[in-house]
Amino acid sequence: IPLRRQRQMCIRDRATKMGLKLNGIHIATNKNDILHRLFSSGIYSKNKTIKSLAPSMDISVASNFERLMVDVLNEDRAKVSELMNNFPENSIDFNNLKHWKKINSFFTSSKTEDQEIKECVKKVVSETGYLIDPHTATAVSGCPPIQNESILTFATAHPAKFPEVFNDVEGFEENIPLELKNIFEKQQKFVKLNNKYEDIADFISSNYAS
């Protein structure tokens, strides 16, 4: 799973509890690797966000993370609140928490750098003819091969949104929908507004309200 929020991981985790047969979930990150560091070390700590080729994954804190913590802390919501209220000033050490070892054994993780993203995109399109976006590439590149097991990778975006990644990738132009090509050729228009609710509301009601 190319992960930018905890939500995707939690959905699959809940699905296994409802009967979906999964042997594990692999969490793929880009260079903003807060979750990879967590599953590698047991320490949840915030770092500075770094710009990458997979921009939707450029996070320093995983939203919805409390959902996993509820499981780790055996439904102790007061403890979850205490730890999160002190974060990110204080990192969270999961290693001594009751259910961490069991949960951590179900998840693996990886970190994919920008160059690895580019290489993965080129490899997949050359071998299969299928063009994946940079977020999906983190999952394809990061997930280790598993013998005699089926691997399901979640694709998350259309590659045409990321022309700066694919300019030198064969087959990119053919994968851009005509509607999107037409948008790229149009003149960009925008209006600058003051950072005030009243000004924004007036602009919307004056120009777009029916």
Residue ranges, per PLM feature:
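Short acidic, glycine/serine/threonine-rich loops at helix termini
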Residues: I11-K17, H36-S41, E164-N167
